[in-house]
Amino acid sequence: MSRVGVVLLNLGGPERIQDVGPFLFNLFADPEIIRLPIPALQKPLAWLISTLRSGKSQEAYRSIGGGSPLRRITEQQARELQSLLRQRGIDATSYVAMRYWHPFTESAVADLKADGMDQVVVLPLYPHFSISTSGSSFRELQRLRQGDESFEKLPIRCIRSWFDHPGYVRAMAELIAEEVRQSDDPTQAHVFFSAHGVPKSYVEEAGDPYQKEIESCTDLIMKELGQLMGHDNPFTLAYQSRVGPVEWLKPYTEEALEELGKAKTNDLVVVPISFVSEHIETLEEIDIEYRELATEAGVVNFRRVRALDTYPPFIEGLADLVTTSLEGPEVSLDAAAELPTKVKLYPQEKWEWGWNNSSEVWNGRLAMLGFSGFLLELISGHGPLHALGLL
C-alpha cells in the first residue's frame, strides 16, 4: 500500500509571550509579505517592524491567555484527519507545516522524508487562495523541493483552494445556524462575515483570486444556511486586520460594524469566514475589539460563530479533499501557486529592482519610502516616531 504524507499548511503563532517578537520578525522577513529592492534591508526592516509592534501584540496575546492555540488545534486536526483517512483504508500520515513559527515547513519535509512516504498531498488550511497565505506556503515548499533529490522524486498533489467544497460549506452553515437559532428573532438575525483582508493591489494588479473566492464562498454558505433554516437572513461581508496606510479590500470590518450599529441591528451573528481555527484574530480581534466596537455602536446582541477546529463534518470534508486528490492527477507546486495574470513571482531567494507592478504588489514604493523616512529620522533626530516616543 502506498504511504501518503498529508502536509497541512498554516500560518503558525507564538505559543508564549516571549515568542511574539521572533514570530513577528519571521512574518515580516518573508519577501512575499514585504519586498525590498535591496536584500540586505529585509531583516533590518523586519526587526524594526517587529520591535515596534511586539508590545501591542504581546498585550493582545496576554488577553487570550498568553499565547496562540493555533498549533495545538492544528495538530489535533492533523491527528483526526489521519485517523479518518486510515479508517478509509488510506495509509496516511499527517504533518503540520507552519509558515512563521514551529513546527516550520522544513521540519514537516524532513519528517515525511524520514518516514519514507511514497507520495505527498499538500492541503492548505486556508479555504481561499491568496498570495500571502497559501501562495507563500506553496512557494516555501517549492524552495525546499528544489535541489532536494529525495523530495523532488516524491509525487505531489497540491490542493489549491477548497472554498466551494460541499463539506466545508455545509459545516460552516451548520455552525452559523446554531447561533442564528439563539437569536430573539432568527429570521432577522444579521449574519456578518468577517474575512481577513489583503491589500487591494494584490487583487487588481497581481490577479489574486482571494476576493472572488471569498464572495463566492459567502453566497454558497448563505444558500446552504437558507436551506437549513427555511428562510433567508440578511448578511454582510467585510474585511478585517488591515495594517498600514495602503488601501485594503473593503468594506472594512470596523466601518461595517459601525453602520450596522447605527441601523439599530438587534442580533448580529459574526462569522470568521477565512479562519478554520481559533487564534488571535478570532479570540482577541473579533471577540474583544470588534465586540466592544459593535456594542458601542448600538448592536444589542453580538454572537460569534465558533471556528471549525475539529468539528466532525469539517474533518470529514478535509478527508474527502485528500481522497479526491489522490484519485486525480498530480498537481505541482508551480501549478498551485500560479496566478491568472502575467505578474512574475520571483523565487524567495532572488530579488528585483524597479518600480513595476510586481514590486508594487509585494509592497513597492511604500516600503522603500517608509524605510528611507525611518533612516532620515534616525539621522535628523526629528519625526513622528520621536513624537510618539518610539525613538
Curated annotation (Swiss-Prot):
The gene is hemH. Catalyzes the ferrous insertion into protoporphyrin IX. Pathway: Porphyrin-containing compound metabolism; protoheme biosynthesis; protoheme from protoporphyrin-IX: step 1/1. It is found in: Cytoplasm. The keyword Iron applies. Keywords: Cytoplasm, Heme biosynthesis, Iron, Lyase, Metal-binding, Porphyrin biosynthesis. This is Ferrochelatase. Its main location: cytoplasm. One of its GO terms (cellular component) is cytoplasm. PANTHER family: FERROCHELATASE, FERROCHELATASE, MITOCHONDRIAL. Fe cation binds at H196, E281. One of its GO terms (molecular function) is metal ion binding. SUPFAM superfamilies: Chelatase, Chlorophyll a-b binding protein. Pfam families: Ferrochelatase. It comes from the Bacteria. Its EC number is 4.98.1.1. Belongs to the ferrochelatase family. It catalyses: heme b + 2 H(+) = protoporphyrin IX + Fe(2+). Transmembrane segments: none annotated.
